């Protein structure tokens, strides 16, 4: 038995080398999407349409005694079924041009410096921080996450420095390619078969680690309801975030920690919970301003944490008297190698946290941050002290 995965374009047989077409007609079983199978009405063997998950297809191919060909769009290893099937079966892969290659050729742009991602069959959540700042972004779409939906999504984060190149039905009889503003794309209908390239035509705003406090929209700036820049920077450093970290921000308030974390964990997921509805709305305004698409929940932790994916990093800015129950959930669900960072203002909260972590088998390290900022006084300068903060870092004991 031999299994060949052959890439095919929207122009069907015209996209195939003669050798590939010969293999198809000599095979016993031809497998593919209905659209691909329709190109081979005269195939004499068995035709199997791919429907639903791929696990049943793998079992079918494992038991196949004859030669089988699997048809896939473009390059089977570029967000295609080839990646999955090659880990389960002994296959040979013969790619066609990927839709992204074709789209860049139509745009007449090089593509080795582009960022590639897909929202095909996937949630669009988190896309904003993943792509923010890249000069060129290639995106595989689907009917739900269409170019129209994508344009509206990007507009909601103010990402108007991008133009959208939409390539429809590439290689087919009804091929159409357009370079549009986001506003234009947001009001158009597109063929379901399309790919999108975002091209930056103006510089994107840049926010380095340690965003100034007054950059954030604050509901009560005079009340200090924000993790101050210096404390925020130290706390995020203690979390030791990776590019794909899953992060919880408990008691998010303005969302400052969630936002800074998202700039590091761009490929990860950011979750934030806040008990005060007005503060949560304030957080959402900041998320939009700083181009962070986080999961937000209104509730008093641990309420709402069951909606979050298991974390690699947890920041706790406030517990509202529920430290024990919050730490129960955080410690039990923390992924291997993860960290919890808790900010405490009082000695009593420090003692409670240290005791709670020890009882749960966690090792702790504490930094007392006593920050003072320079402040002008007439023609001189003095220092104005911020409240001392205990930064407690906890990880599972070895």
From Swiss-Prot:
Region of interest (Cobalt-precorrin-6B C(15)-methyltransferase (decarboxylating)), residue spans: 206-398
CDD domains: Precorrin-6Y-MT (cd11644)
Source organism, top-level taxon: Bacteria
One annotated GO molecular function: cobalt-precorrin-6B C5-methyltransferase activity
InterPro entries: 4pyrrol_Mease, 4pyrrol_Methylase_sf, 4pyrrole_Mease_sub1, 4pyrrole_Mease_sub2, CbiE, Cbl_synth_CobL, Cbl_synth_MTase_CbiT, Cobalamin_biosynth_MTase
Lineage of the species this protein comes from: Bacteria, Bacillati, Bacillota, Bacilli, Bacillales
Official protein name in the record: Cobalamin biosynthesis bifunctional protein CbiET
Provenance organism: Priestia megaterium (Bacillus megaterium)
One matching Pfam family: TP_methylase
Family the entry assigns: In the N-terminal section; belongs to the precorrin methyltransferase family.
């Amino acid at each position: 038995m031999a299994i060949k995965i052959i890439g095919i374009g929207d122009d069907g047989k015209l996209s195939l080398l003669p050798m590939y077409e010969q293999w198809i007609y000599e095979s016993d079983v031809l497998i593919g999407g209905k659209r691909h199978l329709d190109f081979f009405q005269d195939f004499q063997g068995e035709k199997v349409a791919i429907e639903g998950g791929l696990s049943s297809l793998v079992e079918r191919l494992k038991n196949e005694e004859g030669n089988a060909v699997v048809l896939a769009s473009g390059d089977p290893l570029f967000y295609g079924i080839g990646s999955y099937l090659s880990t389960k079966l002994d296959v040979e892969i013969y790619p066609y041009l990927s839709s992204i290659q074709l789209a860049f050729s139509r745009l007449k742009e090089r593509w080795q410096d582009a960022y590639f991602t897909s929202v095909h069959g996937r949630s669009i959540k988190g896309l904003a921080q993943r792509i923010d700042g890249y000069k060129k972004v290639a995106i595989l779409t689907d009917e739900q996450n269409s170019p129209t939906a994508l344009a509206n999504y990007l507009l909601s984060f103010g990402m108007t420095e991008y133009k959208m190149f939409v390539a429809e039905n590439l290689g087919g009889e009804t091929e159409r390619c357009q370079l549009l503003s986001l506003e234009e794309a947001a009001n158009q209908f597109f063929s379901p078969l399309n790919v999108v390239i975002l091209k930056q035509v103006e510089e994107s705003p840049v926010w380095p680690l340690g965003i100034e406090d007054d950059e954030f929209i604050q509901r009560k700036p005079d009340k200090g309801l924000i993790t101050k820049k210096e404390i925020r920077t130290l706390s995020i450093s203690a979390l030791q975030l990776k590019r794909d970290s899953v992060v919880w921000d408990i008691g998010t308030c303005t969302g400052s920690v969630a936002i800074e974390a998202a700039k590091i964990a761009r490929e990860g997921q950011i979750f934030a919970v806040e008990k005060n509805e007005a503060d949560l709305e304030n957080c959402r305004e900041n998320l939009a301003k700083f181009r962070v698409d986080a999961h937000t929940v209104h509730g008093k932790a641990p309420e709402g944490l069951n909606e979050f994916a298991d974390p690699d990093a947890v920041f706790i800015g406030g517990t509202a008297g529920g430290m024990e129950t919050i730490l129960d959930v955080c410690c039990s669900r923390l992924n291997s190698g993860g960290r919890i960072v808790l900010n405490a203002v009082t000695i009593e909260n420090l003692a409670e946290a240290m005791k709670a972590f020890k009882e749960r088998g966690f090792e702790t390290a504490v930094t007392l941050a006593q920050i003072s900022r320079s402040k002008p006084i007439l023609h001189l300068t003095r220092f104005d002290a911020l409240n001392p903060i205990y930064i407690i870092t906890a990880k599972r004991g070895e």
